[in-house]
Amino acid sequence: MALTPGAVGAAHATATTATTQAPPLRGSVATPLPAAPALPGPALRSTPALAMAASAATSPLDLAAVKQAVELIGKGRVDEATNIESTISDPLARKLVEWLVLRSDNSSADFSRYAAFIAANPSWPSIVTLRRRAEAALWQGRADPSTVLAFFNGDPPRTAKGRFALARALLSQGDSARAQEAVSDAWRGDAFSGDLEAQARTAFSGLIDTADDKARMDARLYAEDDDAGISAARHLDDTELAIARARVAVINRERNAKALLEAVPAAGQRDPGYIFSRAQWLRHSDKIAEAARWMQMAPHDPAALRDVDQWWVERRLLARKLLDLGDSKLAYAIASGAAAPNNENYRADQQFTAGWIALRFLHQPAVALPHFAHIADGASDPITLARAYYWQGRAAEAAGHERDARGYYETAARYPTAYYGQLARARLGLDEVTLRTPPEPRADLRGLELARVFDILYAIDARDVVVAMAGDIADKANDLAALVTLAEIARSHDDARATLRIGKKALGRGFPLELYAFPDFGIPNVEPIGPQVERHVIYAIVRQESEFNSRVVSGANAYGLMQVTAATDRDTAKRFNVAFDQRRLLNDVAYNVQIGSAELGNDISNWRGSYILDFVAYNAGPRRAKEWIEQYGDPRDPKVDPIDWIERIPLQETRYYVQRVIENMQVYRVRFDNSPKLWIESDLRRGS
């Protein structure tokens, strides 16, 4: 059933350089095959909430005022920005500054300002954030009960402060039952500071019972919020406090964790939270079989587990450790025995992991198939759906049901921008990646209120604000023409970040915005200082590493477009005889790309051309790449299945990263080569 394209030719190994300016959108992509099935998308609205009347063009004076307000807000001087707002004559520019003020962490606006903006602008970005701020203002400003009850009429609170404000209002009207319910919901489900906890204990002392404190203790410890967990435990008995202290020791990997676990009274050792931490400590201690035994003692009732998402994360780590030890049967039991997670991605991951173990390690396709089918439950994004149908195809194929397998592969192949959609196409012998063409931008929609907001922000070079708006808009808007208009504005300003943000979010919801989701601009032309790397590889990396943000600094202190660390910069600069200057990693985009692409090219050579190992090393370091070769075999070995090898990568982040970069490469080849040729199987085998 499989059909492998020929090996990548010599011409494919020649580097090209990128362009800085956004090229014309048309003509840069192959026309979709007539037989290619349409990707289902969300229902579209003909008259979107985005299409609101806009005022005339903003004057230079108003633009200067908006620019000054943005700068002041960035410095935390929000009240001064509010003063400037009152001097702006353009209503839309004034509204934009008000939105920026209300959205700021340093805003001192009262509830009435938040409520007025939310009521007048329900389709604006960040309304959920503004509503959360409004709830805080209700609590902190001790708003009168009628105001509080009116605000929450038909729209319940989202935050602890909102729930506490509602409870206070209900108590004032004698409704203690509903007040207790609001307090209990906050106590059991919300994260909040110690100061707010003290305020709430004083205000609602008669409404918080031991069950609330026990639930809070568990919830905060699953979230690894040590202080809040211990604080709640201090209102419980000695056994619960002992459990909490033992769990904190496990979370922090303290040397006395074992002693504290063993000191918990026998009755407390049946507590689900204790079982979780005991299994976690055993896994940390490489006592995997014993950890699995404890894990299997856990209850299956989600209510007893409290945090089914964290239980799944622990089970996933444990199941993979069991696979490493060769105990596939127990690994399957651990994975399949998990309570269904609440998080959509975790639910899909749990079903995939159980199905993958059943199919590829236990060789039981009939057991695997229903797991793979459940991956798609409630999913809408191409990556998840393609994975669901591809693996159903693999299970059906393994069971000898070729007709069913073909049907599953054909469904997966509807998602050609997704890794498993691309693999499904290769499995079917479809050697092309087809991208849908969005509708032409409509000039009449340039009058959209938010389109004009984009114009204002670009006029004052406030691109970070555009990016923040873009993601929220694309998450919620259902008007395709409006989304194309906003994406085209971003593209016309050479803003790869905002173009990507709109395209990527919208593509994940089924809209045909592939050409915006994979910008073919945003990386400057550079003279390579090391081995040349193809343009589609560099773009694939940048899209995943930084999403074209040249100023981003990661938690690991990686800098800029290609997320280069100072150590890499120093080593690469020395290797290729270039002056080392760490400051340039953020201040000089071309330098960042030179260093990053040189590192990438050097590593590709070191790994004999293997993209898989190069991308693993780029994300997780060469040491881990070598460790995983030792543990799982060499993906360059023809006897090793590269698809399974990638799925065996222990780090979730790196596993996801490699798949995303490989899928990005397939799309960027289409964009840059103007050819729909699919190379994914050759890419996975590169270096063999």
Role assignments for model-derived ranges:
Residues W99-L100, A115-A120, K287-E290, P302-W311, ...:
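Catalytic glycan-binding domains that act on GlcNAc-containing polysaccharides
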Residues A2-D62:
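Compositionally biased, proline/threonine/alanine/serine-rich low-complexity intrinsically disordered stretches
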Residues K75, S104, S108, G141-R142, ...:
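Structural motif corresponding to the intra-repeat A-B loop/turn of tetratricopeptide repeats
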Residues Q68, E98-V101, A134, L166, ...:
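Structural register within alpha-helical repeat arrays
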Residues L72, D105, L138, L170, ...:
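Residue at a conserved register position within TPR or TPR-like alpha-solenoid repeats
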Residues M52-T58, T82-L92, R103-N106, A115-P125, ...:
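Solenoid-like repeat scaffolds
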Residues A65, A93-R94, E98-V101, Y114, ...:
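TPR repeat positional signature
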